[in-house]
A protein has these predicted regions:
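Conserved N-terminal catalytic core of the sugar/cofactor nucleotidyltransferase
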Residues: 2-5, 13, 27, 31-130
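Short alpha-helical oligomerization interface
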Residues: 19-23
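A structural signal for short hydrophobic beta-strand segments in well-ordered beta-sheet cores
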Residues: 25, 173-175, 239
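Alpha-helical elements of Rossmann-like donor-binding domains used by nucleotide-donor carbohydrate transfer enzymes
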Residues: 61, 113-117, 143, 226-227, ...
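The conserved acidic donor/metal-binding loop of glycosyltransferases
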Residues: 133-136
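Conserved donor-nucleotide/metal-binding helix-loop-beta segment in metal-dependent transferases, i.e.
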Residues: 139-167
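Catalytic-core segments of class I nucleotidyltransferases/pyrophosphorylases
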Residues: 145-146, 180-248, 252-264
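Conserved catalytic core of nucleotide-sugar-dependent glycosyltransferases
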Residues: 165-181
Length: 264
């Protein structure tokens, strides 16, 4: 299984903080957002490689971060913009950066096209754990992988969201008693359930042809949830109910809130 990190956006809502620096590498305390996530995912036996799909502007910064946090050599003379993280886990699985060639927010490919680009560039023909690297998570992805193995289908995550206003800004799924996905809507004005879908997915090898041809068959390009919505309509999918919470870092306010709550 490949872990594919979607990190090609330009995080314009964070202003100057991410004008020349990728949001996934912003630190919450001693660790970056991405570092916290990979510390967990790297421990999953099924994962054999991490793939970071990013843009041309930020690709060198990710490469520098990987070198700083995987080399066993002294890092004291490295560029101070990306430093070795304290208590760093030396990742056991290789990390590959894929550069999508874009340099501005206006020319971005969109999350779905970025995933397809990485799949084509690396000739990925394996199960994929696809994640957005702008969340702090309070559970292990191992639980999600185990759930997908048990169901034998591609899977999404879900969590109960009581706020109608928040449901109107995200993907919402209808489920049966076995957590099989019956339907999915993106940003519905009238949500049909309280099950919200965060940007974490498992696409199994048997469904990769559907993924590869999704955009040419009408799938939206911009948000990773567009692909999940498309896949729900074309194959059997199940939804894993998150066993604990997450913290979405989508703005300057939420970034500083994350530092205050979790960066000590």
């Amino acid at each position: 299984m490949k872990c594919v990190v979607i990190a090609a956006g330009y995080a314009t809502r964070l202003g100057e903080l991410t004008k020349n620096f990728p949001k996934p590498l912003l630190k919450i305390g001693e660790k970056s957002i991405l570092g916290r996530m990979l510390d967990d995912i790297d421990q999953i036996p099924e994962i054999d490689e991490h793939v970071i799909i990013t843009n041309h502007k930020f690709a060198p910064i990710f490469e520098e971060w990987i070198k700083a946090n995987t080399d066993l050599t002294d890092n004291t003379e490295k560029n101070q913009s990306v430093q070795s993280e304290q208590s760093v886990v030396r990742y056991m699985k290789p990390i590959t950066v894929v550069d999508d060639g874009t340099e501005t927010n206006d020319t971005r490919l969109g999350a779905v096209c970025d995933l397809l680009y990485a799949m084509d560039k690396l000739q990925i023909d394996d199960d994929m754990l696809v994640v957005a690297a702008d969340n702090l998570l309070f559970f292990s992805f191992q639980e999600f992988v185990d759930f997908a193995k048990e169901k034998g289908t591609s899977c999404i995550m879900c969590h109960e969201q009581p706020s109608i206003e928040k449901l109107q800004r995200t993907g919402v799924v209808e489920l049966d008693a076995d957590m099989k996905v019956l339907g999915m809507e993106e940003k519905p004005q009238v949500p049909k359930s309280h099950w919200a879908v965060p940007p974490f997915y498992i696409y199994q090898k048997q469904d990769l042809d559907l993924v590869r041809h999704s955009v040419e068959n009408g799938c939206g390009k911009d948000a990773p949830g567009n692909l999940a919505h498309y896949m729900v309509e074309h194959t059997t999918m199940h939804a894993w109910p998150m066993s604990a919470g997450r913290f979405d870092i989508g703005s300057l306010d939420t970034y500083y809130e994350a530092i205050e709550k979790y960066g000590k």
